[in-house]
Amino acid sequence: EKQVSVTEFDVIVIGAGVAGLTAGTRLAKEGLKVALVTTGESTVCLSTGCIDVCSRDENPLLGVAGLPLGHPFREVPGELIREALTDFQARMAEMDLSYAGDPEKNRRILSAIGAFKTTCLTPSTMEASAQNEDEKIHIVTFAGLKDFYPSYITARLKNASFSTYDAGAATTMGIAARFEDEAFLEAFILWMEQLCIHEDKIAVPAVLGLESADEIIRKIEYRLERPVFEIPTIPPSMPGRRLFNALKDQYRRKGGVIYWGWPVIGVEKSGKQIEAVMAESQGRPTSLNARAFILATGSFVGGGLTARRETITENVFDLPVFV
């Protein structure tokens, strides 16, 4: 029989996405002993790094208020959503990852295939994104990069053109790492200056650095004297990874504990009261006890839900799922 170790916390958060890390940080900041349990890589890394609220209305708060009765988002007051978004922007600014946007006004960003995505808050590196098909933009792509399609964009945007730079790397992560080197950035800017770009804006796939994208984009804009913006690539995306790293680092700074790569394999109850979750690492089970539990496992991609032919199942507590 396996030996089970027991660890006590005030709150256990299950899931390491935006919701889980934000909740954990807020609680740890209040002085509670918080643990976050996750199976591994967060699906935030697959995202654009943008924060969507409700894309059906130009004003996302009005969009939420207009959702059908019974929709869970209708239960959240607009003032609370506004406060949460403002708090998120302040916390990300603390981590040198500034976000642009207004809780009461949706915006559009250009995607890797030339379509427009409606969102609420964007990394500031996307703030200057084209807003319609008529804008004059020059796209700079990178030799061998498979997660970005400039020809799709120029097919949809009649005033767009593109050039290709050989970064000596062909993955989003590899190119982003190169941009952290000042000599590489200087060579890239010199090459761009020689292009004599005449369009109003410059677009680049979202590879402008691992952690220093804000600073890198400011340097390029200063030298080329026009707005520069990142376009999210096909997942995995650097803006999503930057967001995840900022949230995770902030959570740890506030004193939060992370059980990384620890799938929850069971739940311990006393009647209807949950007292602990059983998590496993390298075949060794650990009972993680807490006074409260927050479920933030997401939906299908993150493993929070499983879809079968007739049913959808919640995988940790077997909670009812309403479809």
Residue ranges and their predicted role:
Residues 9-36:
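N-terminal Rossmann-like FAD-binding beta1-loop-alpha1 element of flavoenzymes
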Residues 11-14, 37, 264, 287-298:
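Short hydrophobic core segments
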Residues 37-69, 169-182:
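Conserved N-terminal glycine-rich FAD pyrophosphate-binding loop of Rossmann-like flavoproteins
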Residues 52-145, 152-161:
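Dinucleotide-binding Rossmann-like beta1-alpha1 core, especially the glycine-rich loop
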Residues 73, 125-145, 164-166, 170-175, ...:
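Helix-loop-beta segment of a Rossmann-like dinucleotide-binding subdomain
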Residues 148-158, 186-202, 208-266:
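Helical element adjacent to the flavin cofactor pocket in flavoenzyme catalytic cores
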Residues 248, 266-287, 293:
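Conserved beta-strand-loop-beta-strand element in the redox core of flavoprotein oxidoreductases
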Residues 295-311:
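Flavin (primarily FAD) binding-site architecture
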